[in-house]
Each structure stands twice: as structure tokens, then as C-alpha cells.
Amino acid sequence: MANTPSQQDQFANKAQAWSARFSEPVSDLVKRYTASVDFDKRLARHDIRGSLAHADMLAAQGIISAQDLADIERGMQQILSEIDAGSFQWLLDLEDVHLNIEKRLVELVGDAGKRLHTGRSRNDQVATDIRLWLRDEIDLLIDLLRQLRHALATVALDNAGTIMPGFTHLQVAQPVTFGHHLLAYAEMFGRDAERLADCRKRVNRLPLGAAALAGTSYPIDRERVASTLGFDGVCRNSLDAVSDRDFAIEFCAAASLIMTHVSRLSEELVLWMSPRVGFIDLADRFCTGSSIMPQKKNPDVPELARGKTGRVNGHLVALLTLMKGQPLAYNKDNQEDKEGLFDTADTLRDTLTIFADMAGGIKVKADNMRAAALQGFATATDLADYLVKRGLPFRDAHEVVAHAVRDCEQRGCDLADLSLAELQAYHPSIEADIHQVLTLEGSVAARKHTGGTAPERVREEAQRVIQETA
């Protein structure tokens, strides 16, 4: 049964749980400056989950009574209901999510609520909350990457034979297929998912039990708490458990790589959608117009994703800078770890959700792609390879074809436009089968090794990714 207010000590009416040590209250400006509840309240459910596991362990170890545990569980359920209903009162004076919840718990269940913090500190408490939250975010992001890869592979399968120019230095290089090009991004995002999964292994270690920095003298069972919360194990050093945020930095580094890959894809979508290129169109729901130019259809989503990549990269640098000068163990600097971390996860989640939808609706303009591939002597390497297969050293073949390209530029024609006699003037080993080699279809079909751009290989790879991400 909850104590009446008159039976409770002054904690219930104090602004801070630690204020008994001080002779004067902090100023209102300092309260605003040091408070984190406006942003860390998003950890509330994870904070409650961690507290319930901690209370269960305390009761199992005989540190608190079974009645205390029952009261704490009842109070926490009430707090969860209030949070879900939007009626929980978050107070700036109480600094953070932890003290707000603890204060309300004491109001609801009295002394049992004041016993909850036995054997722990906000230092190991917040480290646990962040890891619980981040673990869930990683699982969600891995699934969003799966969805994006599935969408890309589906479009790739439909365009396994759609020929486009491949570029190096933004100059026409060799023919590839649009399906092959999209599968390059499917590979990148696959590695991104692997990085997140690997990061999760290091996130999934329990800090709780480290207390402020040196552990606790109570006979706690950290392994029980770890098992209850689904952690793979416990952090093995109490100083390290509360002081480092390398797991958050590692996540932000993985997020920066994902956004970098998104940014590269975005750049190509913007270029491909330009009327000067005209390779694709995006669905209207991903574009906006102009307030002055009625004809405009702007690829705002990929453009903004490019910009948000800088934002995510900035959060990574901020976290690295935050950690670099801190001595062991916990310092108030670490309060600054959350907003950038939260924003990174939010930005990445929204970006991947949008891109999975947008990628699946790309409208391909195959004729424009093919026309572009016919420019720039995209099959010049095929002619060089043809000569090598007839005994010419590659460097000699390279020189022969370079002369042919230069002559064609002067004449305003392509290598495929030359007659057999004209081609044989460059080297007598050239035969009538050369004209099949110099076609776009012949060029891509010849590259049938694993990882090549032959349509049959592209179909196999697309089907593999589709099955992998189903």
C-alpha cells in the first residue's frame, strides 16, 4: 500500500534527488542548460524495462522484498499507461527521464519506489537505456535495408537486359545493363546491413551493475538482469561500462556509410531524371514543383537525402569529438551523446523507408539509355579484346583501337559504322564476326562470369537478392 505524503520523506517534494548536499538551489538557467528530459524522455519505455529487470534481480537476491517488487511493478505499469495516454507530466526540474519516472513511482508506491535505485546509478542506468533503445533501432534499420535491397533487385530483374552506358569519370566507358547498375547498390546496402548486425553484437552487452563507476557492494546478479533483458552478456569492466560510448560511435559510423551509399544513389537519380539525360522518371509523390515555374518537377527527395548525409556525418564527428578528451569515468559531457544519436537513427529510418518505396517505382526510359550507350565509343574495349584474342599483345591492341577511335571522331562516326575493309585497315586479323562484337548486346553478353553484366548473370544475381530479402 502506498504511503501517504505525510509519511514520505522530503524526496517527494524536492526538485532533485541529490539536492540535500547543497546549500542553495541551481539557477533556472542552469536547470534549463543541464536538463535532458526534453529529448531523453523517448527512452522512457526502455528505462522502465531496465528498472523492472533490476527490481526483479534485487528481489531475487533478497535486497528488496517481494512486496516491494510487486509495488514497483504495479507503479511502473501505471506510469506506462500514463505515458501511452500522453498524461504523464514531464518536469524540467527533475532533469531527465530517470528522475521523472522515479519521482512518479515514489508518488504511486511510496518507499518501494525509493528502494528501486539500490545498487545502481544513473550512469549505468542511462547506458543500459541507450543500448536497449539502440538495439531495437538496429533491428528496424536492418529490416529497412532488406526492403530497399528487395526493391532494387526487383527493378534490376525487370531490367536485366536494359542496356545503358557505364561511366568512369562521368565519361562513357563500357556498356552495362541498368539491372547490373542497380545491383551494385544492393551489394552496398547488403554490406551496410552486415555492419549494423556486427555493431549490434557490441551494443548487446549489459552495463547495469557498474553503478556510478566502481560497481556495488550489494550481492547483485548481473547475469540474471542480462538474461531478462536479452543481452548476450555483461560489460566486464565497471569503468568502461559507464564511461565509453564507442558503441554509439560505431553505430553512427555505420549510419554514415549507409547515408553515403544513399547519397551516391541520390546523385545518380537526380542526374538520370534530368531532361538532359532522361534515363528515368520518379513517381510524383517523391517530387515537388516550383512556386514560379509551372513546368518543373524537381527530385527533392534524393536531393534532400544528399543533404541529410552531411547531417548524419556531422553527428558522427560530434560524437568522436565528445569522447576524445574525457578521462575515466563518467562525465556530464556524455549527456550530449543522445540528440545526435537519436537524430541519426531517425534520419536513417525515414530515408530508408522512403527510398524502399521510391526505388520500386522507378520508371525506366530504356530507349534513352540505349541511345546514350551508342555514343562515346562504349565498345572500344571490346575491339581491343577481340584483337588480343587473335594474338596481339593488349598494349598493341589498345594503341590500334585508339587510332581507330581518333579517326572515327574526326569522321563523326562510331566503330560499328566502319566497314569490314575499313576495320581491317587497322589490323588484318579482323574478320566479319567483328560487327557482332561491336554491338551493345554483344558487349554485355560477353561478360558472363560471376559479377559480370551479361543479362543471364544479372538475372541470377537479382533472383538471389530477391530470395535473400524475401
From Swiss-Prot:
GO terms for cellular component: cytosol. One of its GO terms (molecular function) is argininosuccinate lyase activity. It is found in: Cytoplasm. Gene3D superfamilies: Fumarase/aspartase (C-terminal domain), Fumarase/aspartase (Central domain), Fumarase/aspartase (N-terminal domain). Its EC number is 4.3.2.1. InterPro entries: Arg_succ_lyase_C (IPR029419), Argininosuccinate_lyase (IPR009049), Fumarase/histidase_N (IPR024083), Fumarate_lyase_CS (IPR020557), Fumarate_lyase_fam (IPR000362), Fumarate_lyase_N (IPR022761), L-Aspartase-like (IPR008948). PROSITE patterns: FUMARATE_LYASES. It catalyses: 2-(N(omega)-L-arginino)succinate = fumarate + L-arginine. Pathway: Amino-acid biosynthesis; L-arginine biosynthesis; L-arginine from L-ornithine and carbamoyl phosphate: step 3/3. It holds the Pfam family ASL_C2. GO terms for biological process: arginine biosynthetic process via ornithine; L-arginine biosynthetic process. It comes from the Bacteria. Keywords: Amino-acid biosynthesis, Arginine biosynthesis, Cytoplasm, Lyase. CDD domains: Argininosuccinate_lyase. PANTHER family: ARGININOSUCCINATE LYASE. NCBIfam families: argH. Belongs to the lyase 1 family. Argininosuccinate lyase subfamily. This is Argininosuccinate lyase. It comes from Bordetella avium (strain 197N).
